[in-house]
From Swiss-Prot:
Protein name: Protein P
Domain Reverse transcriptase: 357-600
Site (Priming of reverse-transcription by covalently linking the first nucleotide of the (-)DNA) residue list: 63
HAMAP family: HBV_DPOL (MF_04073)
Stretches the record annotates as Disordered: 219-249, 290-316
Regulation acting on activity, per entry: Activated by host HSP70 and HSP40 in vitro to be able to bind the epsilon loop of the pgRNA. Because deletion of the RNase H region renders the protein partly chaperone-independent, the chaperones may be needed indirectly to relieve occlusion of the RNA-binding site by this domain. Inhibited by several reverse-transcriptase inhibitors: Lamivudine, Adefovir and Entecavir.
A GO MF term: metal ion binding
Stored Pfam families: DNA_pol_viral_C, DNA_pol_viral_N, RVT_1
Spacer: annotated segments: 178-346
Biological source species: Hepatitis B virus genotype B1 subtype adw (isolate Japan/pJDW233/1988)
Listed Polar residues bias regions: 290-299
Positions of region (Polymerase/reverse transcriptase domain (RT)): 347-690
Keyword Transferase part of the UniProt annotation: yes
Catalytic activity: DNA(n) + a 2'-deoxyribonucleoside 5'-triphosphate = DNA(n+1) + diphosphate; Endonucleolytic cleavage to 5'-phosphomonoester
Amino acid sequence: MPLSYQHFRKLLLLDDEAGPLEEELPRLADEGLNHRVAEDLNLGNPNVSIPWTHKVGNFTGLYSSTVPVFNPEWQTPSFPDIHLQEDIVDRCKQFVGPLTVNENRRLKLIMPARFYPNVTKYLPLDKGIKPYYPEHVVNHYFQTRHYLHTLWKAGILYKRESTHSASFCGSPYSWEQDLQHGRLVFQTSKRHGDKSFCPQSPGILPRSSVGPCIQSQLRKSRLGPQPTQGQLAGRPQGGSGSIRARIHPSPWGTVGVEPSGSGHTHICASSSSSCLHQSAVRTAAYSPISTSKGHSSSGHAVELHHFPPNSSRSQSQGSVLSCWWLQFRNSKPCSEYCLSHIVNLIEDWGPCAEHGEHRIRTPRTPARVTGGVFLVDKNPHNTTESRLVVDFSQFSRGNTRVSWPKFAVPNLQSLTNLLSSNLSWLSLDVSAAFYHLPLHPAAMPHLLVGSSGLSRYVARLSSNSRIINHQHGTMQDLHNSCSRNLYVSLMLLYKTYGWKLHLYSHPIILGFRKIPMGVGLSPFLLAQFTSAICSVVRRAFPHCLAFSYMDDVVLGAKSVQHLESLYAAVTNFLLSLGIHLNPNKTKRWGYSLNFMGYVIGSWGTWPQDHIVQNFKLCFRKLPVNRPIDWKVCQRIVGLLGFAAPFTQCGYPALMPLYACIQAKQAFTFSPTYKAFLSKQYMTLYPVARQRPGLCQVFADATPTGWGLAIGHQRMRGTFVSPLPIHTAELLAACFARSRSGANLIGTDNSVVLSRKYTSFPWLLGCAANWILRGTSFVYVPSALNPADDPSRGRLGLYRPLLRLPYRPTTGRTSLYADSPSVPSHLPDRVHFASPLHVAWRPP
């Protein structure tokens, strides 16, 4: 007969009328009993003949995507001019005195951040924007391009101008200026002798081919005088000839063009174009070396133009033939839905490409992307704004995957010890936190996004793909992309974007200048950054509490007035560092703080309400006696695991589910097991703050017996049959708790000390978790453990009771980082009369 829920409760000793603990509890460690119960509850039955269930409520398998909804009305969020101050360390020193080693190390990590994976896969530009919304292809394309353009304008992306140069907006950092080689102007130098120059004037030498060899030439040229190629690498110095170059030929003086797809293009410049007189440079553009490459994977026509810094070339200068959009102007409409109708709507479509305020040399950057992008809702509560999702998952896959650095996240108990207090709280919202942290330009070639331009994008997605050999020469080919759908979409988009339709229809390649969200390194860097800043704030205001997890920063103070003055001081400090706060999203929590999915107050910690609603819903939808796909079980365990510490039996109750997931087997909920779990989760208990104290109760065990020292009293007992040592120690701790009621127990067993009871026999783990809930353990070496003798059956010998103090841990968050001594010449910081009447230190 299957085990009923009532019997099961009794078995786990969750009822009050259980027999004496010393007899009942060791039974739960019995292997036979555990097997019988598992069979009764149908827990370990991997061979299932019925098909698996792949959906439970909102939970589908981990890898099956919930279909995202496209919103044509999405607003692109605006990004403030985010520029984290480069002298952040000095500013912090002014604020709080010398920094600790930890703070220094963490702030250096992000100034600038570096990311150099061993292997980077380059994907064709067509994969730049993911066809995530097949019904709204064109709309999604333009919204994504607009989002990328906004990020570039805000200084978050670099724009690849050529193989070795990029441009960007916003304030440059010193490590970018080091690479700038005189910004847009390349001044030729007279180093290494003049042999290679044309006799008349300083100029640029002809190059027969430009290819990957450029780096080796740059290396060679540092070694001293070189024939012919040496000039290229000289740092700009002296010389008055200044030459400005556009798009593909990099502004660092190469007159060759390297198209992205095909090997090398050999352009031998004629002598007239290679020896340029200074006057000619100032008045005229280059002799027209222009290779119109049709649509290679970068799709740019390459021209060299003389253009003053910051000017965008208007389309009249450019070769109209090279621009897919403007070609429609001169062509006859092919139908009423021809794109030429749209192109003829306005006279000036603006530039084919825009250039940033600053230009910079980069390592070799191919005309490819390394990750795709698409748009989704900003968050479940805000569907009016979009968020850009960047898929750089290539760095987390395969043999060459990058193993991301691990970082400490406080566990629930540490968090409670830290934040559970009678303080008033508020939380700050850092806007676009990831985009605060600058990346070194050398990382740009690994983090490329972009698109191959509208014509390729539309052609690739139309059912009869018409790009054959990438020939877009003839008018017939041009009109192949005209269709009613495209026409209607573009007409609607014209109202939103106007002349920018032309700009966005061109191919573009962008690299990240600040850390992107889709790389495993970013959360680590953000956590290091905010924790260092909070550490500085904590030391500056020792009577308050500042704490952060990723971009979530909370401040606590003893009274509301004090909190407001702290808020003002901290906000000014953060703004002075260049950190952007969103004042509308500052939340004042009163005495119960909402943080990391928990509600934390003076009584302890509790899961937030929406999470409680989630698992109530989950239990309502959970099918009984039907095998559930282990991937769905992963989702269920993820949700239930979050709230497990608040239940009677904790994590051990979920062990059967964990075992199934590890074995990649379907799991079947029996009515009793489901009833047991749902009852566990209907009654939650807060996790309380641990208090410091003096340990008076000690437990110890041998495989055959147990002993306790409670104050001056000693007790001992034996087990019916020998038990594994960890199991025996756990039983001894349970007896100590139930006999003395003490919530501070000394033990010499590291497994009991860790309070992780998932590796014990299942029934014992569940029961022990309930008995030892809220107990703190202190480590006592065996040689000093007063319970050691009783456990070996010797009651007569008394070891003196230890005075073992217990300090609750706050994980790796050091609240008391002692400030390094302040040099005497610094004036004392002004002390304002604190609104605290009592000297108070954080818990």
